Amino acid sequence: MFETTAKLRSAFLAYFETQGHQVVDSSSLVPHNDPTLLFTNAGMNQFKDVFLGMDKRSYSRAVSSQRCVRAGGKHNDLDNVGYTARHHTFFEMLGNFSFGDYFKEEAIRFAWTFLTETLKLPTERLCVTIYETDDEAFELWNKKIGVAAENIIRIGDNKGAPYASDNFWQMGDTGPCGPCSEIFYDHGDHIWGGRPGTPEEDGDRFIEIWNIVFMQYNRQADGAMLPLPKPSVDTGMGIERIAAIMQGVHSNYEIDIFKQLIAKTAEIIGVSDLENKSLRVIADHIRSCAFLIADGVMPSNEGRGYVLRRIIRRAVRHGNKLGATDTFFYKLVPTLISVMGDAAKGLVETQVIVEKALKAEEEQFARTLERGLGLLDNALNELSGKVLDGDTAFKLYDTYGFPVDLTADVCRERDITVDEAGFEAAMAEQRSRAQAAGNFGADYNKQLIIDEETQFCGYKGLSGEANVVALYLDGQAVNEVTQGQDAVVVLNNTPFYAESGGQVGDKGVLSAQGINFSVTDTQKFGQATGHQGKVLEGSIKVGTKLAAEVNKDLRQRTELNHSVTHLLHAALRQVIGTHVTQKGSLVNPERLRFDFAHFEGVKAAELKQVEELVNAQIRCNHELNTAEMAIDEAKEKGAMALFGEKYDEKVRVVTMGDFSIELCGGTHVGRTGDIGLFKITSEAGIAAGVRRIEAVTGAAAMAYVAEQQAMLDEAAGLLKSDSASVVAKLKAQLDKTKQLEKELSQLKDKLAAAASADMAGDAQDINGVKVLVKKLEGVDPGSLRGLQDELKQKLKSAIILLGTAKDGKVNLIAGVSNDLTAKVKAGELVAMVAQQVGGKGGGRPDMAQAGGTQVENLDAALASASTWIAERLA
């Protein structure tokens, strides 16, 4: 009955729907209005504001199958993916949720009933864990459900602090939290591992399949646990794990989804060994990559786009290992859509974009992969130790586009590690290499050439009737499109705004009797407007009359951000200077991004002044006036033009009081007061002479203010002050720290002077030259430079080599007086010693520093230095 993951997903959603739960679609992998997350990584993410009491829904019970990615930041499974049975970059989290509705008894009963009655799992294979003091949960499991006491395992604070437990869930240091109960499945005694709470619990025999979180407390800043007035429930069950159980396999990579993706990958590349771990890596990575692109993330060198690029390139590298000689990764998308079933809805709509973006990235990487792998191979062959230096790893990243974890992946196969600290240091030195974010796939459909002309009628209304004048399927003109097909529909007139001037295209619906076309984007093709989307019902022919309806909510939120962009532009010119000109923008329902020419970072005081000026204009509640006029007349009136836009002789001018006047064909609010509130969220440089401001408006701005206030309150709690005193309290703390650091530095200098006086007497005479080679115990690495300077002053003409080991790292410094550098160079000396401790270094002839990781080799390395020096002094 549940031989496929798709059927299992449907059964889960259907079961909870019969129990009064609202089926909620998976949210995007890009978290909405949550700066704490890189990617959506749990089913509860989209309900976070509901649990926090900041949002309300029309339902109090929900169920979902949430797409999740864990491949960056705190939740980073990338290194283990493909090498273990259950690590993935992408997974689906099945979950049911109660927002102040049912609580422990119902949540426990729902889970047990689904597992034992719907899925018919044998109860003798199941055991549960509870928080150590949660007697209520114990009674429910034992008395109500009938689980034997020996199969209910109490887990205490096993992470070193109160409430720090595998069975106590916390959203953060403060806020909703509570005990949780986990259900485990026993895969059988033929697999090593022990029950939860035993020393063998990390084995693969007992696997957690369902976590039920009981949010019943609100943790205060002082640690106090106050009962929530309306306790809630958040549960999660990884679909891959339960699918493995239902399909009678132990590894997630043996379930239907992965079997088909692995088989297809092997077929495309021409591989017969289906157990090869590289096939697992590729099968996993196509899921995260395809769905990330479908949710709007594109490969780039920063943020989410960089994580995506890392995953794509790791998959391509494993394809190369398998013998792939041509692009292959994008060819897995159709198979992925097939195996994901209903969960692939968004992927179906964006399939063309996803495939083209994957192919473009693969082709770009393929051009450098072979050369980069050759360089890495040479570096590893020449390596004498077991650590690849950070400079080489950075060169691979900087020159060949190798993410450092891909380099680490190759090294791992030879039992070699990468000096990640050295890599980060090299990265910091060359940070100026940053480039603007990539835009793979953004313009693929704009390659269409359409001779038709569409009249825009969306300034005053969001609906209207129109005739279909052209249809396009896969870039080709057709006379008809039918249900299930992705198409571009061209109308003779439309209320849909096509992407232009930074404003995103409208979304909505085209319909008629028996026809439903979902518009997911609107683009310009010459004089025509193309409505991109999918035929959900019926068929559309050229000549069909359709009702066009723009998504009102998305349009209105976009208009808030577009109108405030004009105010922002004018405010920047007033505060910073008239040299400020727009270099680009993005205006969508969620936020606005404004790029402008400016020679330096905008000062905090200037940003505050700009924000206050914009909000003052919002409060003025100016009416927005539009007028069409000749472009020369508009310029005479002082209207500003948008970067990169082409204008006709007749232009549309948008005016807001006497504050802003711009050429603009976009849609706007009726009055500036409609914007409500404007908040700047970030300001940064994106290229030489170009700055970027990101901001939010309306409800999104209110949410941002609330979030900032919450953080301020938390900071006040940590400083044991009120919000108004945070700055003064923090300044006092910093002043105190600065004074302590000054005193510590002075003390170190005194200690170094004293130590150098003692050590100077240990210098040996080698061929008439004073040579001091010494290992120092318990010396801070930061003190080496001062100590070396003191010794050079005392010894006058001398060669000095000092080494110390701390926290698993070796630090070396060499000093040579100027009269001896012709024979012995400090850089060569320290490099020779560093090589023996798994490190690298260098410097000037008279002073050089180095580091290493092989602490155990330090004594022998220092001992070899005297011989090396003697040979050069002979």
From Swiss-Prot:
Q: Which cofactor does it need?
A: Zn(2+)
Q: Which Enzyme Commission number(s) are listed?
A: 6.1.1.7
Does this UniProt record's set of keywords contain Signal? no
- Enzyme class (EC, first level): ligase
For this UniProt record, the keywords arranged alphabetically read as follows: Aminoacyl-tRNA synthetase, ATP-binding, Cytoplasm, Ligase, Metal-binding, Nucleotide-binding, Protein biosynthesis, RNA-binding, tRNA-binding, Zinc
Keyword Zinc on entry: yes
Q: Which is an annotated Pfam family here?
A: tRNA_SAD
State the reactions this protein catalyses. tRNA(Ala) + L-alanine + ATP = L-alanyl-tRNA(Ala) + AMP + diphosphate
The GO terms this record gives for MF are: alanine-tRNA ligase activity; aminoacyl-tRNA deacylase activity; ATP binding; tRNA binding; zinc ion binding
Residues where Zn(2+) binds: 562, 566, 664, 668
Principal location: cytoplasm
Q: Where, per UniProt, does this protein localize? A: Cytoplasm
- Tell me which GO cellular component terms the UniProt record holds: cytosol
**What's in the domain note?**
Consists of three domains; the N-terminal catalytic domain, the editing domain and the C-terminal C-Ala domain. The editing domain removes incorrectly charged amino acids, while the C-Ala domain, along with tRNA(Ala), serves as a bridge to cooperatively bring together the editing and aminoacylation centers thus stimulating deacylation of misacylated tRNAs.
Instruction: Give the matching HAMAP family.
Output: Ala_tRNA_synth_B
Indicate what this protein is called per its UniProt record. Alanine--tRNA ligase
